[in-house]
């Protein structure tokens, strides 16, 4: 029956695919909306879910019992009715997955696995397809998971029974009854927590099968990851199979340890007690459905399943069964598990099931994909992986990724991906007959959504995560809700928090079950750490989602796929959720935290899904990676063999040997890291993995994926980062103990709080947690073995709580790390996207970070987006650099691997990065992580967001400075890096923490976090030194290979320097060994190379951007959180170590700073202010990581400056697209996306007292330094003046002029990206001259009306890529002329001023001025965003502006002294003051508005601006000679003027809220007001032929519009015809007034008619019709002007009429009607008089001529009234439609349209507006 119904349903679907898709999408939307509303507040999604679960328990306790009975009793789910095809499909999938999981893994039914295994295995193929489709419809899959138990009709019940029998031995491993909650008459959550003895109440008919999963099963339905964490449901029986497959021991401990007894009770007893076995109720987790269904009807469903899968992929692509299993699972766990441990459950189950799931893993919703691969492996090795991928949408990047991505993506995306799924699906179904079952399950799934009230509620809980994920993914800015991350992540958090011991047990059991090796155990420990991080990820949930959202739809899909969002929260669908939960939960079976990747990879991944960690999605993505798909299919047996190992290596088909034999160090670690994989990173990385990983790099890629994902995810959450640091410290401690910790490591992993793991799962989303967990896991796999050899630092890093897995990795890489330090990319610390809650991804990663990076960052994330993207980009660059370095030195490979682990997210981000390099870097990162608790953060570029980035940056700067100094400082940096990375990676998260500024912060942060670094001081010094440089350079961007082979392109250049770097690395290693706690060895290879110096300068600028992007508050929070987490994680020892280390580091940095200042004063006077800044940062060190980075920055000022200069050259050579820059800047400052979001990357910390003191000190120092700098700058300017003409290339400019000024400026930026503190204002005041030049001019040029383009004047001077010639001069602080020409350098100049532009520019430091130039065009909106986003809150922004105004007022006083008081400078000062006042007045007032106003006023004629620019440039040169400040201000002023009419020198400073210094300098362009008489239009020619041509053109366009069918095109053609008619009428005006009148009047009638057709679109507020609104605005303007013109044409007549009428009324003539009048004039009077006439009212008789005149007067005056009324309507529409920016830009480019505008001006204005609209419609992305 079930098969027949399935066949019927398949036919129906074939006939009704579109309808079903629409219905399913609608249902999913509704379901998602409901779940989204339920989980709308992501602040306490777990609380809400817990309350809901408790509510379900109370309300449906009996119902759950009924449900169990009905689930098993009713086969109707399997046999879907026409009414419930979708529900049946969902349930069918769930049944298949459940049966399969029960049979292959520890079956819910405890039946001999043989009976159902074949079916389940067969099912996985079909089921995988179905799962993929379910992935697309997460809500549907969630309901299917809920309804699966109901669907377990006779056949399913039989399957379940068989599976129970088959899986009894598996369950014996899991011992579900042991974990099952004893029947205490306490109702389970709608049967989700159904107990074996309890009958399930089937209050929801469609979810009769789903009812049991309602509590935890929802999460279980969300994915097999739910299986672990919940799926706290009987699903643990189902999930237990998954977990059993991952690690049989883990499965039972999961259920037992589930914080919510329900899930455990569901897992254990249900299978033995009922046909459902109560377990079956848990199987309700969709993850199990496929196995149950598969077991039921393997062969017949096969064909049906193929069809069903295709249909389901089309219909449910967003929410495949896997998604349902995973997504409901994660939310269920969160809801069901009131405690954080639920996430751990996810991770645990994922780990345990992975091994057994091999082929069965498909049973798990998220692992459905895996089973598909396993069963399909022979037949559908290509297709199977693809099919496998879709269920885990998170793995979009893989070949299947499109499908998976579609699955992850919202319904529209799901529809897109479904088609490939369908194609792929049919093939896998052929491989396995069982797949057809999936189809009915899917059908049932939709039904469950529609029909099952209780089940729907459960599903809503499950689908809440899915829906919220979808919504979050849909709304890039809504990531904070991130229901996906919330549902799966919070679920994983609950599991990780509540079930730390369970996770430990599960992991221990999993390790025991696998008995693979240390590596697997280490992986588990790492996963646990990741789970801890996942717990830390509680805060990162929002950030995680935001990262994904910020990344964008593409990145969202990719990120979802990459971060295992498929299960967790790829908002798009249940598939994503299932993948996220399953993949995230398992994290690669080896690590509960990293489990997510396993679920996405394969059945093994489904096990990881059981782990149900939010980061597990990253793992699942990793598993879904192409290498995972083919290999898991091939490795079905291997995966089933060891769930954890299968996770680590099951998808590890490529890494099976490496993981299994090597202790799963390669794959399991990567999988673990994958658990923390950032959603955004996943998109980019998956494709990359598809390319590189399938072959050699499977193991490394697993590590890389885990690390990358972990990095990306960990970046998002600061707490996670702190926790990761602590976990890393524990891991480092374990490194010493790892050999002894084989059993202990499992215990340690279990001991790690699941909360931490949960946070890590979020971190995996955000990148920081996952990088922390991933780095730890990768460390255990890749470098723990070598780390042990490492001296004290590695040992110090060994934290008792850290998983032993790190030991394995650490052991191998230590020597390699030392070697790799110079060569290997120090990427690990860099990539700190998570610094601000992403984005996000979001916001995209810095565009400058790397070209390759930026594109992957497109979306997201990730998100994450922008920040996550930037971070990923940096990571990619670092990965490429690390790969190059690794290639150069094989011995360095381990260190490079650790760096790669950190850079892995970057590599994943950048599709161009080869995976091998990424893998090597990941290994290096792992080693570094093992060495340093901060190593985790540093190891993951994304993890740099963990505020660990500072170490990398700190290390990088010392390296840049010199080999000796870098080695000495790098030693300190290495230890400091551990602590500072955590802080700074969070700060660097947006800017990738690669920037030198970050590095100094890293040094200081390392001093603060030295405890972690102390343990791994030696190792950290070795691994971190190279990785620091690499990461910092990678953060700079792929182009910046200077500091290390951080970027692929940069790596090429750096490879030459890599050889010397290796030698220097040896010296650095020695230095590190000497003082590991004090220094981190930064890439020394660049020290001796001049070009490397330039690169260092560039990297410095980049790091400063990232550093400034991170706020001191964030850093402080990270430090505090890190310390707290360390205490919580029993890392007090390391904390103690860190504290002394921090103190030592601080002292050391201070000494270094002093020395460096002396050196800089001797060598580079301009750097002195930076040093002072660094000192001030050191003072702040306790308060923020920025201080540490600042101190380290001082040590590496000169080298970093030079490197940044060189990088600037590369950057200018490799110009990033202005659009990318703008996107990066916007995302960074977009509060929703990452940059300054929430805490705000550029948070102005009101450390007024400290800042005032620092400012005073800095001002004094800066004054001295400025004098020196001014002298140097004058000299340089003279040199540059010579070079001004040749300075065509930014590289040349950088090399020649950037030396000292760039360094000086760069150190500021490097010192504090986030520090927009008031102290910055004082600092900037001293440094303002240089900063103003670079920042204001650069910003102005970037923000000029041209936008990305450099102002025309600047272009004439030649400013490459929007480098303003004059403006850039200030940035370098050198000759204004030279720097003006060398825009790139001045960008560096801007970068060096993290405190000035910390909010705006520091974040975009990699993009630097280029981005700002780009911003100039998009100036209005982006500036606003940046200014507002730069400040964490409006209040802060207000406060900041007020302080800025005060400081500016103070600074302005000295500035006049410095500057010759010329009118222009006075005007600019006045303008700055005025702007500051305006900013103060409006807390949220964006500097954009002020700048725009300035731009409007500025647009004197370009000639005037040019003249002023030249004059100012001369003044600047003179002033620079006389005084640096004067020069800086003059250059800024000239740069502003040069920037073009829209020159807004203060724009950047204002928009970035660049503390008063940028605004304070007179560079602020003086307001230039446009005169109404300036552009008096010449009269049109009287040539009749020309007029005829105009008329013909108008008629031609009107006729074209008449035949146009597209509403927008029609409106634009009509409007063009109108303006041509207006030109014709204007030309006729001189010939025939009457004809002109007629023409205008007819034109007005025509335009009114056209406007009436456009009104319906105008009323629509959605973005689709935004263009229609703008057309309406232009139309209203034309109507107004035409009406006014008609009045003007009749003005004389109107005057005569008014005079005549006035005379009539004044004279009073006119007969008065009296009652005796025989007849009244009006018929009404006659009627009223009724023949007498006596009742007619009195009145005047108006003569006919007067009446006619009154009518004419009314007509004329109506024109006047209409003119003003229509104009006001247009203005209102501009404001209500949020089109101010568009109109403002149009006004700037074409002059404002006023009531005085001539028809020719109207013509130009409207034509320009329509052209811009068409471009926007044709190329929406470009807009």
From Swiss-Prot:
Stretches the record annotates as Disordered: 1-87, 126-305, 422-544, 570-626, 686-712, 753-1057, 1071-1287, 1322-1350, 1413-1448, 1480-1531, 1547-1567, 1715-1744
Biased composition (Low complexity): 1-41, 126-147, 156-174, 205-249, 475-531, 599-612, 764-785, 877-906, 917-947, 962-979, 1002-1057, 1102-1161, 1182-1203, 1253-1280, 1497-1531, 1715-1735
Bias type Polar residues, positions: 818-827, 1172-1181, 1334-1344, 1480-1496
GO CC terms, sorted: nucleus; super elongation complex
List of residues that carry Phosphoserine: 463, 465, 859-860, 939, 941, 1486
Pfam family, one: AFF4_CHD
Basic residues bias locations: 839-849
Alphabetized InterPro entries for the sequence: AF4/FMR2, AF4/FMR2_CHD, HMGI/Y_DNA-bd_CS
Similarity comment: family membership: Belongs to the AF4 family.
Protein name: AF4/FMR2 family member lilli
Gene (UniProt): lilli
